[in-house]
């Protein structure tokens, strides 16, 4: 549900005029996929960009829908194509292996395969496709650079910067670096090919996220590191850094009486972060656009703050100006 002016969440027929579709979807609504084996195929993951969406299935690959002005849906750009009220759902192919993760950036798409390879398509003006140029790419193309031959276990993007984590815990980045996201390897504001980031001091990385102007990683010990520009989580005095700085574990509830607390999962929106602990608690910080942090105020939050919820938080997702949590009730 949500904004649908580019059919980014499918075609939903109007009840008043059956020839038209809704531009706003106000309640959860099913999206029929063009499946060959609907009884066997399940949706594994969905990712949403500015105006396009990717759907990963277990047996029939990846589907895309919405705006394809830059090739972000993995198909040829058609001049003058009208995306409003479009019923087109495209099956993306051209992969050498099964896709196991899909991630939408603002106007680009990333795909990770079972072999640990990364493919990209879409808008590339900041190098966010990682294909060695700054043009658009209409079809998924495999990335090389420093990730060539490396087993990538996770990819992350949100705006125009991209990060990738290897099975050995190394971090790679490409795309926009206007806000110091990739300043550890270059003074350029754009990087068009994956580069290894020399963040040895953070330990073995298990997860990375990147927002509009900042980034963060979580290591295997449950410690969280942040860098870039904006509200990073270490108070109002740290608004810019090109090297990762650890957010004190005590801000997530670690103490001598509770030493086993660890951050287990990390999420991000355009300007805010969310962290889940192994105790089922949710902490948030960053720009509090329209109250998206859920902390009872619309003030920005400069360090992690625990969100009060009646249960254990199982998962969380962050949008541009909203946050959704999946909670298991105490009762």
What are these regions (language model features)?
Residues 1-331:
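Eukaryote-biased RCC1-like beta-propeller repeat architecture
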């Amino acid at each position: 549900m949500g904004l649908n002016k580019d059919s980014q969440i499918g075609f939903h027929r109007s009840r008043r005029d059956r020839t038209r579709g809704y531009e706003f979807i106000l309640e959860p609504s099913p999206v029929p996929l063009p499946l060959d084996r609907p009884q066997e195929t399940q949706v594994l993951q969905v990712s949403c960009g500015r105006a396009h969406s990717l759907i990963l299935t277990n047996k029939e690959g990846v589907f895309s829908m919405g705006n394809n002005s830059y090739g972000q849906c993995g198909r040829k750009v058609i001049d003058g194509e009208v995306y409003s009220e479009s019923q087109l759902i495209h099956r993306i192919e051209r992969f050498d292996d099964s896709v196991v993760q899909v991630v939408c950036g603002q106007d680009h798409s990333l795909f990770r395969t079972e072999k640990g390879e990364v493919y990209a398509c879409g808008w590339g003006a900041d190098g966010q496709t990682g294909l060695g140029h700054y043009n658009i790419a209409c079809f998924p193309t495999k990335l090389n650079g420093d990730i060539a031959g490396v087993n990538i276990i996770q990819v992350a993007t949100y705006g125009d910067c991209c990060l990738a984590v290897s099975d050995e815990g190394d971090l790679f980045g490409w795309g926009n670096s206007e806000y110091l996201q990739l300043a550890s390897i270059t003074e350029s504001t754009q990087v068009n090919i994956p580069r290894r980031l020399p963040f040895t001091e953070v330990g073995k990385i298990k997860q990375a996220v990147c927002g509009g102007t900042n980034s963060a990683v979580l290591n295997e010990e449950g410690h969280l590191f942040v860098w870039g520009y904006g509200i990073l989580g270490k108070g109002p005095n740290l608004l810019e850094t090109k090297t990762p700085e650890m957010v004190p574990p005590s801000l997530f509830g670690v103490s001598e009486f509770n030493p086993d607390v660890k951050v287990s999962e990390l999420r991000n929106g355009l300007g805010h972060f969310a962290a889940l602990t192994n105790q089922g608690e949710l902490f948030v910080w960053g720009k509090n656009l329209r109250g998206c942090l859920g902390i009872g105020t619309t003030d920005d939050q400069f360090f992690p703050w625990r969100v009060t919820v009646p249960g254990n938080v199982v998962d969380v997702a962050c949008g541009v100006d909203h946050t959704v949590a999946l909670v298991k009730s105490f009762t």
